[in-house]
Amino acid sequence: MERLLNQLNLGVLPYITTKDIEDRLRDKIVAKAKLAFIKDCFEAVVCENGGLFVLTGGAAVTCHIDDDRSALKCIDFDYYGFCAKMFCNLQTNLQKCVDQHYAELDVLTRQVYMSDPLVVLKCYQNGAYRLNGQINLHLNRHIKCIKTQYNDEFDLVRFALQIDITSADGVDEYTDNGVKITTAPLSFNVFFVNVRIMKRPFNADRCIKNFSLFGNEYHVLVSSLQRVLNDQLMCLLKDIFTNKFDYKIERRLKHLKRLFANLPAESYNSCVNDHTDMCLYKEQNETITNFVKKILDISGPALGCRKLMHIYLTTDTFSGQLPAYLTHYVNYPHKSLCDQNWKRFMSCIFSLY
């Protein structure tokens, strides 16, 4: 393992994690599946269960910008209300969707190409996998449901395709105790439906929008424009710090610019110097991502972005501050790029005006 880490830190070995593999599989399988698969999953969630489902994430973006061409690699919801049978019904109905579209999904899975040998690092453990020889992928017929007690605001329920990956000459598993060779498949979760179970009554802004991907008269309940913008800004921050490909960051920026164009004119009238609220100051135990989210939630995306740039230019609040989701990564090699990534994020949000 030490030899792999030396190669990683020298830049000889690319930093590819299990999460990167799962993200690539979403791009190559779910995003390339026929639209009927995502539509069936959407209806399995919304139409067959009680409570209130609010569409969020990338699907909400397509609704607000009336985009009928973007491919969706997952659908995200906020769920308000509680039904004891909801989780079982939801998994059963989504399993039926996968069963119905299995042949197509299986073909897309087998078409995914990965070069060999391939080294994949574990995110939260000091370990890695090295796949030797031709790499083959197989789609498991059964989906997986993962429930997480997330925070005081919501719990998270995610549904995933299970992809088994094997290599012709076996897999070397690197751990603290040495190297173990195995022929057993590696299993990866490809999340295609995410549901946040909200713990508070619904009191947020929402709107009805046409989901043009599904048809001209297909109306859905989505998060408000400002909330969708704030969520996408946080996603942009994560894209930059997790070293997503430039084309993905550019695509995110393109969508953000279209969302900003829909904001009412009065959103731009406030001056950052007119606001001396305490939210401009990061609390001692507050993570940098929570601080950014707080600024955006309190001030809205237009004024919030200007406040963030003002704080960045006049204080050292962001200096050396690594987002919380990266502090838990073991062997993350790009900590030295932290300040450079903050500069890139601020340049990106400046370009939105």
Curated annotation (Swiss-Prot):
Pfam families: AcMNPV_Orf18 (PF07134)
Induction statement: Early protein.
Subcellular location: Host nucleus; Host cytoplasm
InterPro entries assigned: AcMNPV_AC18
GO cellular component terms given for this protein: host cell cytoplasm; host cell nucleus
Keywords recorded for this protein, A-Z: Early protein, Host cytoplasm, Host nucleus
Chain's role: May play a role in occlusion-derived virions (ODV) formation and/or regulation of late viral gene expression.
Official protein name in the record: Protein AC18
The species this protein was found in: Autographa californica nuclear polyhedrosis virus
Source organism phylogeny: Viruses, Viruses incertae sedis, Naldaviricetes, Lefavirales, Baculoviridae
Gene name linked to the record: DA41
